[in-house]
Amino acid sequence: MKKFKINYLLIGIVTLLLAAALWPSIPWFGKAENRIAAIQSRGELRVSTLDSPLTYNNVNGKIIGLDYELAQQFADYLGVKLKITVRQNISQLFDDLDNDDADLLAAGLVYNSERSKNYQPGPTYYSVSQQVVYRVGGVRPRTMATLNDQQLTVAPGHVVIDDLRALKEKKYPDLSWKVDEKLGTTALLEQVKDKKLAYTIADSVAISFFQRVHPEIAVALDVTDEQPVTWFSPLDDDQTLSAAILDFFNSMNEEGTLARLEEKYLGHGGDFDYVDTRSFLRAVDSVLPDLQPLFEKYAEEIDWRLLAAISYQESHWDAQATSPTGVRGLMMLTKNTAQSLGLTDRTDAEQSISGGARYLQDMMAKVPDTVPEEERIWFALAAYNMGYAHMLDARALTAKTKGNPDSWSDVKQRLPLLSQKPLYNKLTYGYARGHEAYAYVENIRKYQISLVGYLMEKEKEVTKAKQIAQSYPVVSPHELNHPATTSILPFVAFSADGAFERNHLIAPNTLVQAPRR
């Protein structure tokens, strides 16, 4: 996944020109006939989105997501409340615009020429490519030419349908596919994971997030090059909303807020390691349950799952772990650090976790106050790994090379430079293995994402099992000993095949010749 960087100078110029052209309708709040005035009068910004880790996601009662945070800040910018509507698929999103049930769509949607004919795109803030995925162990397709509607299913309204049509017309005449009129991309990825589908197509960022929890999903083919992601709003003569969106993104860039959000949600990208992720998730099932109470006990204001991810990166949750340099235990503490924290046994799980948590808190307290709150943890982790002094050197080097020393995105790019002699000779604290600190922090972020997503999946499975159990009638001991002549389970199948047919009612897929969008 490659970030699509906005030409903010161009956006600024376009914003000014557009504002000048729209001067009769600005200030936006003065006239009831324009979109901004209508939003102000209503007192809420109506945004439709999709439920996904990147766009909008409920994690333990807290809503997170790149598009959610951007939409919330845009609502604040307009001085109104945010009203979010979550839809199941992309077609339903555009239906909301068509039916005037939404002011804009913020859902990681890709810009293309077909969509721009009917809807107004906003600025682009990252990019994705569309990819065919399959399940590890299944048959991997080697070319698009072999795919047919018995194998490949895509979500309704998906931008890739236009690309598939073009490929069919120009290159692969036998290419065909199904469109499931109900299920979104995430649900189709689940079906591939569960071996109910052979292949589907999703964007590279969605796949990257999904693989952190389900490593058995693998990329088979690239369908497209990088495509810009944007918001969409209604397309008509009233351009006040699109002008406001342009101005908002321009101000977000100038303040550095957009860069921080991109780093928060997109900065952990990189090559996916199937073996490492699978090993981690197996350890979550087999080892973490014994350690989780300790992580929860000593995490304090740190997310316990982040503390657990740090420990896995340090020791793979091995209390007896010892490195060639002499650091030991679950949190791999040095002897001097352990003594300063009053620890007597670094291989004792509770002592190691409590000591590591306190040491990390100390590092966070030392991070300069100018660093944004949500990024302080990454600076602290770099200091935890290579030492606080070298973290200060990395900040100083960032400032000298015209970067922002308070931006983790800028600082982490300079970390590998700390091992280059022409540069570290000019730094206060000299040589450091900055490339290791970079990998250290990035790995922890990936483990945290995997852990959060995996635990959420397990909670959903438990909830689903309870709902299924509650749907069956309760049988008393008396009824067991004196069964009625009429079965209390009237829908029990008469054969194994019949059971499958009755208990797996799957909505039919529809083969389409021409997608609606």
UniProtKB/Swiss-Prot annotation:
Residues 33-269 are annotated as: Non-LT domain. It is a peripheral membrane protein. Its EC number is 4.2.2.n1. It catalyses: Exolytic cleavage of the (1->4)-beta-glycosidic linkage between N-acetylmuramic acid (MurNAc) and N-acetylglucosamine (GlcNAc) residues in peptidoglycan, from either the reducing or the non-reducing ends of the peptidoglycan chains, with concomitant formation of a 1,6-anhydrobond in the MurNAc residue. Disulfide bonds: none annotated. SMART domains: PBPb. Its main location: membrane. GO terms for molecular function: peptidoglycan lytic transglycosylase activity. HAMAP family: MltF. In the N-terminal section; belongs to the bacterial solute-binding protein 3 family. This is Membrane-bound lytic murein transglycosylase F. The lineage of its organism: Bacteria, Pseudomonadati, Pseudomonadota, Gammaproteobacteria, Enterobacterales. The gene is mltF.
